[in-house]
Amino acid sequence: MRDAPDGGAGLAQQRAFAPVHGALVMRQGTGVMFCGDSSAGKSTLAYACARSGWTYVSDDGAFLVRDRADRYAVGDPHSIRFRPDAGELFPELAVHVPTVRPNGRMALEVCTRHLGIFTAPGCAVDHVVFLDREHRGTASVQSYPEDRALDCWAQYTCLGTGDVQTAQRRCRRLLLQASLWKMRYSRLDDAVSLLERLIDQTTSSPGGHGR
């Protein structure tokens, strides 16, 4: 997961933000967060969405702003990190050379200004989508249980004083007001198309997105 935005002091970050391990993108003003483990394809899907005209906010780490009640999160829109073989999925990435990260793993990190995509520093989170990339067949989506979502987010409440951790948990609970989904997919184009239909349906329905 990425560091908090702007590289500020750790204590200030803990007091200002609630970190969430997730990618963040936006389509026509609707914010979508992708959650899941390290192999779920968060960065890859975020970039696939951006290539289709979405706005990119962050690939692997989003930070909820604790003093806001609208589930607003910020990220690092200036770069995006891929697995070394990302050029096999996205030919335009083949010219970039993987480098060794501090953890010893190879990764491909690319400045978004070289990719011709829309970016933004943050957005409100209207949908949270938990990814299952191992599925074979047509992409599908279903509601995701709130308790499982809270369990997933809880693992990132490990820094700061007890009061800070409590405030971070309270902030993450605001994400339960967003629409929670689990999406199974194997093909990126199917996943992007399904997400676009989901957003179109929910934003056009009475009451809009959210719960």
Listing of model-derived features with the role each one plays in the protein:
Residues 42:
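Conserved lysine of the Walker
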